[in-house]
Amino acid sequence: ADVGFAQCGLRRDYVEGTHTSPVGYLEGVFVQEEYRGRGVATALLRACEAWAGEKGCAEFASDCGLDNAASAVFHLRAGFAEAGRIICFTKRL
C-alpha cells in the first residue's frame, strides 16, 4: 500500500536564501495520516536530498505556508533553516 510520496525537482532560478545553482527543491511531501510520526516523511526527504546530490546540487530548499505549523516543525527538525517569509499577491487582468 502507498503510505506517502514526495516530489522534488531542480530549480535553476533564484531560490530564497541559496547561493548556488541548481538547487534541489522539495516541492511537496505527503504521508497518509495513519503513517505519520513514523519517519516516513523524513525518509522521503532523505531520498530527495540524495537524488539532488547526485544531480550536482550543493543546496536543498523547500517552502511551506505561513499557517502550516506542522510543516514548519518538520522542516526545522529535518535541518532546514528559515530563509525568509513572503506574501503572495494576485490580481485579475
Model feature map: region roles:
Residues 84-93:
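Active-site/acyl-donor-binding loops of N-acyltransferases
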Residues 45, 52-64:
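Conserved GNAT acetyl-CoA-binding A-motif
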Residues 12-20:
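A short, polar/charged loop-to-alpha-helix boundary motif
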Residues 57, 76-85:
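Conserved acetyl-CoA-binding loop of GNAT-fold acetyltransferases
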Residues 19-33, 87-88:
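Conserved acetyl-CoA binding element of GNAT-fold acetyltransferases
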Residues 60-71, 90:
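Conserved beta-strand-loop-alpha-helix junction that forms the acyl-donor binding cleft
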Residues 1-10, 25, 30:
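Conserved beta-strand in the GNAT
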Residues 27, 31, 37-50, 73-77:
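Conserved acetyl-CoA-binding loop-helix of GNAT-fold acetyltransferases
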